[in-house]
């Protein structure tokens, strides 16, 4: 009973976490790029 719920939570959190890290890295890249020039 617990495993499907756990799989659903993991499958829900993983894309959000990856998207959050990607957005954060992209914003830091833009900020660094603007600061460089």
UniProtKB/Swiss-Prot annotation:
Keywords on record: Chloroplast, Electron transport, Membrane, Photosynthesis, Plastid, Thylakoid, Transmembrane, Transmembrane helix, Transport
Gene Ontology cellular-component terms listed: chloroplast thylakoid membrane; cytochrome b6f complex
Locations listed in the record: Plastid, Chloroplast thylakoid membrane
UniProt cross-references to Pfam families, sorted A to Z: PetG
Disulphide-bridged cysteine pairs: none
Top-level taxon of the source organism: Eukaryota
Transmembrane regions listed in the UniProt entry: 5-25
GO MF entries: electron transporter, transferring electrons within cytochrome b6/f complex of photosystem II activity
InterPro entries for this protein: Cyt_6/f_cplx_su5 (IPR003683), Cyt_6/f_cplx_su5_sf (IPR036099)
Coiled coil start-end: none
Biological process (GO), any one: photosynthesis
Membrane topology according to the record: Single-pass membrane protein
Family: Belongs to the PetG family.
Subunit structure: The 4 large subunits of the cytochrome b6-f complex are cytochrome b6, subunit IV (17 kDa polypeptide, PetD), cytochrome f and the Rieske protein, while the 4 small subunits are PetG, PetL, PetM and PetN. The complex functions as a dimer.
Stated role: Component of the cytochrome b6-f complex, which mediates electron transfer between photosystem II (PSII) and photosystem I (PSI), cyclic electron flow around PSI, and state transitions. PetG is required for either the stability or assembly of the cytochrome b6-f complex.
UniProt-recorded name of the protein: Cytochrome b6-f complex subunit 5
Organism from which the protein derives: Chlamydomonas reinhardtii
Phylogenetic placement of the source organism: Eukaryota, Viridiplantae, Chlorophyta, core chlorophytes, Chlorophyceae
């Amino acid at each position: 009973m617990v495993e499907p719920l756990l799989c659903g939570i993991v499958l829900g959190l993983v894309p959000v976490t990856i998207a959050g890290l990607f957005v954060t890295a992209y914003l830091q890249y833009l900020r660094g790029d603007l600061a460089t020039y």
